[in-house]
Amino acid sequence: MKKKPFVTLEKLQEITAKYPTPFHLYDEKGIRENARALKDAFAWNKGFKEFFAVKATPNPYLIKILQEYGCGCDCSSMTELMLSKAIGCKEGDIMFSSNDTPEEEFRYADEIGGIINLDDITHIESVEKAVGGIPKTISCRYNPGGLFKISNDIMDNPGDAKYGMTTEQIFEAFRILKAKGAEEFGIHAFLASNTVTNEYYPMLAKVMFELAVKLQKETGAHIKFINLSGGIGIAYSPDQTPNDIKAIGEGVRKVYEEVLVPEGMGDVAIYTELGRFMMGPYGCLVTKAIHEKHTHKEYVGVDACAVNLMRPAMYGAYHHITVMGKEDQPCDHMYDVTGSLCENNDKFAIDRYLPKVDMGDLLVIHDTGAHGFAMGYNYNGKLKSAEILLHEDGSFEMIRRAETPKDYFATFDCFPIYERLLEDNK
């Protein structure tokens, strides 16, 4: 499948005339269409709710779009909780799934009406101490261990993951929580990441639904919801077939009716915590070719770097690249596309065949809408870029400004050197 940018060269030239590269650009039209598709795919479940994984794209202007489609927020830190509260999340709109959690974060999550999802059985005591008791509604994260397989393919290795409780622990946790006053329970699991198959969610659902039946029978706990978390991936590479969310929703429905309904559990709500699927394809990193180097290899240097998109450097992840205006030209030049960090892994592409790149060309790096800007950092003193939203009507606006040296040096503002640091930036 050929990957096409959601923005034209002409529109990009209009945007770059106002906002300098590099920047992350988001597609409002795509975000809305995808949110509607998810909602429709699970419309069969009366209590369905998506809790957007804030960690993927922590921008309030983008999350507020998702709120229009009934989405809540999946948070894992104090600042994510603060952001969610600020955009109007109410009781029941926040799922707090964290690990190694400070007590003050449990306390704040409870204060703002978040549902606490316990990562470990020892956290029961921490929550009880932090909030002065056990919340009436609470969730536990499950890790069955071993390998998670679909057919003969290993999807991931839950047994090697730091998250969640064992089977024995989650049964014990439910008994303890029920004895301490919890009235409504949820179970949660994340067993594989970025799966590009329509089978993952139905397979996970079967595991979770069967667990829910046993938990309710053996502990007497009322299971209110089952959180399938994230894991639905996106097609980063042109040779991958995107997931079909309608088929995924239908697959989960079939398992729901096979496992839960006969046990009198047809009122259990399905929750999801999708991040990558909700935003990934609807963001791109726009950068400009500013240098070329001809040594042992052919290099194209761009004005973005791993600070703007860490995934290729950190994971060796593939992100498709389009040289704007040259989409129909032959990809007959092999390049390493590099940033300016003092690290040799600061490469967006290695040995990538592209059309001939001329200096000043605009390059679109695809599928950066999740875990793109969010994973940015300041190594080498680099500053994080702006975020721009392309509206459905073709207009655009900045939804986060680029960092400045003042931002970078802000934590020195209580020291005498602060003013000297900013002498040339006033």
Where would I find each of the regions flagged by the language model?
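Active-site loop/helix belt of alpha/beta enzymes
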Residues: 144-291
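Flexible loop/turn segments at secondary-structure boundaries
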Residues: 58-61, 102, 147-148, 193-197, ...
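Conserved, mostly hydrophobic/aromatic
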Residues: 31, 55, 77, 109, ...
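Charged (often Lys/Glu-rich) extended helix/loop segments that serve as interaction or gating elements
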Residues: 260, 265-426
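Glycine-rich, aromatic-flanked loop segments that form ligand/cofactor-binding clefts
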Residues: 133-147
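Structured core elements
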Residues: 72, 95, 115-117, 139-141, ...
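A charged N-terminal "starter" segment
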Residues: 1-136, 171, 177-179, 183, ...
